[in-house]
Regions:
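Cationic-aromatic interfacial patches
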Residues: 25-146
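Hydrophobic h-region of N-terminal signal peptides that target proteins for export
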Residues: 11-20
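Well-ordered beta-sheet/strand-loop patches within structured domains
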Residues: 20, 25-27, 31-44, 55, ...
Length: 460
């Protein structure tokens, strides 16, 4: 009975389906909405990141908005047109593309064209900032926090979007620092007079100037000028002569360094470098005790805080002279000490530091490329008082007194043969030969520098 009933129901269902209209039997498929048009990506490696930044924020009007406008767009185009000097070699081409995109947006009044122009300007700016903040070559970074790093477009655009005035923000970022801006103006003038190509000297000085901050408190040592500058709030508040490395006889030019100083040492020991110990060894071997006593030297067991003092006769000085043995030699604090009364160390792999000196006659010389690489300062007390904000002369006579700073002070040792002065640009002899491309180990990396002249004045 149940089987018969099931058969009957199946037959009825089949009849009903067969009698239904064909269109009713077809299940209607939902009609897909046409895809929303996407804004074209700018021709930039940062194009995808830039578009994603805008999409996440529902396309903010960074460039066409109230904080941007004509002044910011004009500033951007000026920056891009001379960007090869800054290391962005396709800057003029990008400027032409951006200018065309802006023109299309203004004439068409098409929202998609406006968005495309926003992306084009944002990508161009992100590319430029990455170019000027590219990692520097031939710099010893004693403090990794000071190293140039390539910024992500998100950060670049967030700073631009947050700026009260976009035009002023662009000008500030592109300025980099007063040294860089002044040298760049020279490079632009050279390009205008030389078929679009500035001198190698200007381009290499620009590359070396890039590591210098635009603000803050820091020490700047310019080995080409043979002077130390005390910079505070972006202003040069004092300077003094220095003695720097000898590139000719000793072949020890002072390298380019970016580091941070955290303390000074009053009444320092001088630990004699190994190569000098080897050099002195033949003379010491003739009369070890008398030689060391006359120069206030002593031999120590190790570099620990409380090393054992060794007898001069315990060292095989002939073996030291031959290079088959070594020893640790240091000079006690006092009038003969090569470090003078104060030493200003900062981390770096070459062991370079600032220090006082008992040899004052060197500061009267025009050429002060005399040292083994370290930097002898003309007035240690003035430098110390500026660093610490107080007079630290009365520190006593105890040896090796470490005086900590409340806050570390960056130290930038560079080599600029051209710098701004009160009367224009001062130029210095290229004693190290680093104004020739590839003269430094590994070569300094700079832009092509070729620009289309007549593209506008350089923003400072």
């Amino acid at each position: 009975m149940m089987r018969a009933l099931a058969t009957l129901l199946t037959a009825v269902a089949a009849t009903l389906i067969a009698s239904a209209p064909a269109e009713a039997r077809k299940k209607k498929q939902p009609v897909a909405a046409p895809p929303a048009p996407q804004v074209a990506l700018p021709a930039s490696a940062n194009g995808v990141n830039v578009r994603y930044y805008y999409e996440r924020r529902q396309y903010p009007a960074i460039w066409f908005g109230a904080k941007g406008g004509d002044a910011a767009i004009s500033q951007l185009l000026t920056i891009l047109r001379r960007a090869p000097i800054d290391g962005m070699n396709n800057g003029p081409t990008v400027a032409a593309s951006v200018e065309a995109a802006v023109q299309r947006a203004r004439t068409s009044n098409d929202p998609m064209q406006v968005k495309a122009a926003e992306l084009a300007m944002a990508a161009a700016w992100a590319d430029y900032v990455q170019a000027i903040k590219r990692p520097s070559t031939n710099v010893i970074y004693g403090d990794p926090a000071l190293a140039q790093t390539t910024p992500h477009p998100d950060r670049t655009l967030a700073l631009a979007e947050a700026a009260p005035s976009l035009a002023q923000h662009l000008q500030s970022v592109a300025s980099i620092n007063p040294y860089y801006s002044a040298i760049r103006d020279v490079a632009i003038a050279e390009a205008a007079a030389n078929g679009g190509r500035p001198s190698d000297k200007a381009l290499l000085n620009l590359e070396r100037a890039r590591i210098i901050p635009g603000s803050g408190k820091y020490i700047l040592v310019n080995s080409a000028e043979q002077r130390l500058h005390m910079i505070e709030g972006g202003q040069d508040v004092g300077s003094m002569k220095v003695v720097v490395g000898d590139p000719i006889e000793l072949k020890l030019p002072t390298p380019i360094i970016a580091s941070t100083m955290y303390y000074a040492i009053a009444n320092p020991y001088w630990h004699v470098p190994t190569h000098l110990i080897k050099k002195f060894a033949p003379a010491i071997a003739k009369s070890p005790a008398a030689y060391l006593k006359s120069r206030n030297y002593e031999i120590i067991s190790d570099f620990g805080k409380n090393p054992q003092i060794l007898e001069p006769s315990s060292v095989d000085w002939k073996a030291v002279a031959a290079g088959t043995a070594t020893t640790i030699l240091r000079q006690r604090p006092g009038g003969q000490n090569s470090m003078g009364k104060m030493k200003f160390p900062f981390p770096n792999k070459e062991g370079i530091f600032l220090h006082d000196t008992p040899t004052r006659t060197h500061f009267a010389k025009e050429n002060r490329n005399i040292s083994n690489g370290c930097i002898r300062v003309e007035d240690y007390r003035r430098l110390a008082n500026w660093l610490f904000g107080r007079d630290i002369a009365a520190v006593g006579t105890d040896p090796e007194q470490h005086i900590a700073m409340q806050r570390g002070v960056p130290v930038f040792v560079t080599y600029l043969t051209m710098v701004p002065s009160s009367t224009g640009m001062a130029s210095f002899e290229d004693r190290y030969g680093w104004d020739r491309p590839g003269a430094m180990a590994g070569g300094m990396s700079a832009g092509s520098g070729a620009i289309s002249v007549g593209g506008g004045a350089s923003p400072k």
